[in-house]
A protein has these predicted regions:
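Short alpha-helical DNA-recognition segment
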Residues: 34-54, 338-346
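DNA major-groove recognition helix of helix-turn-helix/homeodomain DNA-binding modules
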Residues: 63-81
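"A position-specific structural signal for the A-helix of alpha-solenoid helical repeats
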Residues: 96-100, 135-140, 189, 230-234, ...
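Amphipathic alpha-helical segments of tetratricopeptide repeats
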Residues: 115-123, 158-169, 208-219, 253-260, ...
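A short, Lys/Arg-rich alpha-helix, primarily the initiator
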Residues: 2-35, 326, 331
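Flexible helix-coil transition and linker loops at the boundaries of alpha-helical arrays
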Residues: 83-85, 119-131, 162-180, 215-225, ...
């Protein structure tokens, strides 16, 4: 058979990303219907009903990170799905990852990278998108913890939550809202701020709602491990200060067990650090303490060998099984044995892309 007859028309990057977005929409709708959740409740705070309708009609492409955010609000783990993403989205993820790696051990460099990321977002759009802005405000809170007053930290944490949560009385209505791990992580900053304000009872009430949220909404363990360690770490700090030592140990040990079951290292180092400190303080079993110390040293060795910090933040978004669309196009061009000039011209001989633009993606 003539090889030319088997060659499909070259598709553009936009078409591939559009198809990827459509596939995510199908998965999203299937889960939404199965869980009997209204679209309005899931997109609330992130976009309007009309904007989501445009996406359903195919008039607008939603990025993989946005779909991931919406899926996580339903408690769905998205790292299992293979997706095609733009190079820009991969670059944005890597910049955020750099900030996460720096934030706890090199704050001056983290601050510099944060400003660069903000500037990059503002160059591309008139304002920073809601999900990205929430990330920036979380980092700002952590950078400002030793500088701002408790009241200012509380206001900043509430503004960070409001980036994606439209409900003004979210603290009272938390259990009725559909939130993902990144949003719950932001609400923990409000708990911390309330405690610093001396509002201990209110802080504990909110903390308890957040702690129960993943199980109340029946998140699978793989999703729970994205937020339980942060909940546990803050819980250990709060319970210690309130002299609730047994609760502090319990919440830490439960988090460690979850991480072990999921073969996850998210925040495992600070959890181990706190548990060792607690168990030594209260004279717990010697063998248990030695075992925890052994785990801690093992992680230190692994991180040192890979030149990674022991103390870091972790993103709730993932690029696992995500493929760069420009590389997909490049491979398609090679497999079809077409030149750059041929790829940049449609069937009528009209160029729709410059060779210079294609070279950038190649």
């Amino acid at each position: 058979m003539d090889k030319e007859k088997n060659i499909q028309a070259v598709v553009s990057e936009t078409e591939i990303l559009h198809e990827s977005s459509v596939n995510f929409l199908k998965i999203f709708e299937a889960y939404r219907v199965e869980k009997k959740i209204s679209t309005r409740k899931l997109v609330q705070g992130l976009m309007s009903d009309r904007a989501f309708l445009d996406i359903k009609k195919g008039n607008y492409i939603l990025a993989k990170s946005d779909w991931e955010f919406l899926m996580q609000r339903m408690g769905i783990v998205t790292e299992y799905f293979e997706t095609i993403v733009s190079r820009k989205e991969l670059e944005d993820w890597r910049i955020r990852e750099d900030i996460c790696l720096l934030i706890l051990e090199n704050q001056s460099e983290a601050k510099k990278r944060l400003e660069q990321y903000r500037s990059k977002c503002l160059k591309e759009k008139k304002e920073i998108p809601k999900i990205q802005n929430q990330f920036c405000m979380k980092i700002t809170w952590l950078l400002s913890k030793s500088v701002l007053t408790a009241e200012e930290l509380y206001d900043l944490s509430c503004k960070a939550v409001a980036c994606t949560v439209a409900e003004e009385k979210w603290q009272e209505k938390l259990t009725t809202l559909y939130l993902g791990p990144a949003e719950l992580e932001t609400t923990l900053l409000t708990v911390w701020s309330l405690y610093l304000l001396g509002k201990t009872t209110k802080a504990l009430e909110l903390y308890w709602k957040i702690k129960c949220y993943p199980k109340d909404y029946e998140w699978e363990p793989r999703m729970q491990q994205m937020i339980i360690p942060q909940i546990a770490w803050l819980g250990m700090k709060l319970y210690q200060r309130l002299h609730m030592d047994d609760e502090a140990l319990k919440v830490g040990e439960n988090a460690l067990e979850l991480l072990r079951d999921q073969s996850s290292q998210r925040y495992v180092y600070p959890i181990l650090q706190e548990l060792i400190s607690l168990e030594e303080m209260y004279g717990k079993e010697y063998k248990r303490i030695q075992q925890l110390k052994k785990f801690k040293v093992a992680f230190e060795n692994v991180y040192e060998a890979n030149k990674l910090p022991c103390m870091r933040m972790w993103q709730c978004s993932s690029i696992k099984n995500s493929y760069d669309v420009s590389l997909i196009l490049k491979r398609m061009r090679y497999s079809m044995e077409k030149t750059q000039s041929e790829v940049c011209t449609d069937e009528n001989g009209i160029p729709f892309l410059s060779i210079k633009q294609l070279s950038r993606s190649d």
